[in-house]
């Protein structure tokens, strides 16, 4: 059978960043990711990327590589056309190794769509071939924040995402003021990365409203386990609230919809894998929740995969696929073409990323 999986390999790739990617819970200076290759019996090669982010998920490059090695036995000799059945087997075998499973699923789907000469965005629904991404200002002082905002606008990117720590509301507000003054037309997505409690989150939102700071989304202000607090902030803040760390599975999204924990779901494939991500999207859309597409610190490979999913499926209100802009060196060619904030997908087989 030409679509039988014949070979699988995993290779550590260490991608230097242009600046440390800092969030409230930690920072990275190098993206310690894993390149995954799946080869079919007809010679078709699919590429995937696993991007563990220890500060968020606890997963590491070493652990991810080991998980991929263990999972190979579930896939070798299997028909990639049954990828969702294979994804379920991977989830059952290594549920906690989400990045490893995601990298394998990406590589399988890239191989499948390359075999059939189909663009990945067509496979996911063909709704669109274009997205508009934001760019992130990582944690730092007011001077860094203002300079970063000006640099983002100079790139032609219109929306800005801001990482805040949540510990000192006055400090977070000072940074937002500096960003707003430097980029007065830019809508702001504020990512709290679980750093606030209810009192600080509501005080922060009240101040943003009083000062007319254009925050269009407040992402995961509270810790994952504070479901009641997230619901309170969603109900009382007056702003759209996104669940990121709180939305790691389809079950989580169902609970969010039932309990009013958030109004937007941030889909990051590295949190759950591709098959589970599609379930999360379906539940969110059925429940009337907004959608955001994001990622860990990923190269053009994984980001292009996510872009194909978001554009092909449609319905995503917030696009946060900017981490390739922070990667100084990588071994890839192809992927989405970026002009300003516009990401344009090509009509090529698979996700369009190849090894240089």
Swiss-Prot record:
List, alphabetically, the SUPFAM superfamilies matched.
Answer: Enolase C-terminal domain-like, Enolase N-terminal domain-like
Q: Which InterPro entries match?
A: Dipeptide_epimerase (IPR034603), Enolase-like_C_sf (IPR036849), Enolase-like_N (IPR029017), Enolase_C-like (IPR029065), Mandelate_racemase_C (IPR013342), Mandelate_racemase_N_dom (IPR013341)
Q: List, in alphabetical order, the Gene Ontology terms for molecular function in this entry.
A: magnesium ion binding; racemase and epimerase activity; racemase and epimerase activity, acting on amino acids and derivatives
E.C. number(s) listed in UniProt: 5.1.1.-
Q: Provide the cofactor note recorded for this chain's UniProt entry.
A: Binds 1 Mg(2+) ion per subunit.
Q: What biological-process GO terms show up in the record? A: peptide metabolic process
Q: Provide the residue positions that the database annotates as binding substrate.
A: 136, 161-163, 268, 320-322
Residues given in the record as Mg(2+) binding sites:
191, 219, 244
Q: Which UniProt keywords apply?
A: Isomerase, Magnesium, Metal-binding
Q: Which SMART domains does the UniProt entry name for this protein?
A: MR_MLE (SM00922)
Listed cofactors: Mg(2+)
User: By its UniProt entry, which Gene3D superfamilies does this protein fall under?
Assistant: Enolase-like C-terminal domain, Enolase-like, N-terminal domain
Q: Name one Pfam family in it.
A: MR_MLE_C
**What family does the entry list?**
Belongs to the mandelate racemase/muconate lactonizing enzyme family.
Misc. remarks from the entry:
Part of a large, functionally divergent protein family. Protein modeling and substrate docking were used to predict the substrate specificity, prior to biochemical analysis.
Annotated function: Has epimerase activity with a variety of hydrophobic dipeptides (in vitro). Enzyme activity is highest with L-Phe-L-Tyr, but is still relatively low, suggesting that L-Phe-L-Tyr is not the physiological substrate.
Protein name (database record): Aromatic dipeptide epimerase
Q: Can you name the source organism?
A: Herpetosiphon aurantiacus (strain ATCC 23779 / DSM 785 / 114-95)
What are the top taxonomic ranks of the organism?
Bacteria, Bacillati, Chloroflexota, Chloroflexia, Herpetosiphonales
């Amino acid at each position: 059978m030409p679509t039988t999986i014949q070979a699988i390999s995993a290779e550590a790739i260490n991608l230097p960043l242009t600046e440390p990617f800092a969030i409230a819970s930690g920072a990275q200076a190098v993206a310690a990711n894993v390149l995954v290759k799946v080869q079919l019996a007809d010679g078709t090669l699919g590429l995937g990327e696993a991007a563990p982010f220890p500060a968020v998920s606890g997963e590491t490059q070493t652990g991810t590589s080991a998980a991929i090695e263990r999972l190979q036995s579930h896939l070798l000799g299997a028909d990639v056309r049954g990828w969702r059945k294979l994804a379920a087997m991977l989830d059952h075998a290594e549920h906690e190794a989400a990045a490893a499973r995601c990298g394998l699923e990406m590589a399988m789907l890239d191989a499948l769509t390359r075999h059939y000469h189909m663009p990945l965005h067509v496979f996911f629904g063909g709704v669109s071939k274009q997205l508009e991404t934001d760019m992130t200002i990582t944690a730092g002082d007011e001077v860094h924040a203002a300079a970063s905002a000006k640099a983002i606008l100079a790139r032609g990117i219109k929306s800005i995402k801001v990482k805040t720590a949540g510990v000192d509301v006055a400090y977070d507000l000072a940074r937002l003021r500096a960003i707003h003054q430097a980029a007065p037309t830019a809508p702001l997505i504020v990512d709290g990365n679980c750093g606030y409690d209810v009192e600080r989150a509501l005080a922060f939102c009240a101040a943003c409203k009083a000062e007319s700071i254009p925050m269009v989304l407040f992402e995961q202000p509270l810790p994952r386990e504070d479901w009641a607090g997230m619901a309170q902030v969603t109900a009382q803040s007056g702003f759209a609230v996104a669940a990121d760390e709180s939305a790691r599975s389809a079950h989580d999204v169902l609970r969010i919809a039932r309990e009013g924990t958030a109004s937007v779901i941030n889909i990051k494939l590295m949190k759950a894998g591709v098959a589970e991500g599609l379930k999360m999207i379906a539940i969110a859309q059925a429940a009337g929740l907004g959608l955001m597409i994001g990622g860990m610190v990923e190269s053009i490979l994984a980001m292009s995969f996510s872009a194909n999913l978001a554009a092909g499926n449609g319905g995503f209100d917030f696009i946060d696929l900017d981490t390739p802009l922070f990667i100084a060196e990588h071994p890839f060619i192809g992927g989405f073409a970026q002009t300003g904030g516009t990401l344009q997908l090509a009509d090529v087989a698979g996700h369009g990323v190849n090894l240089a």
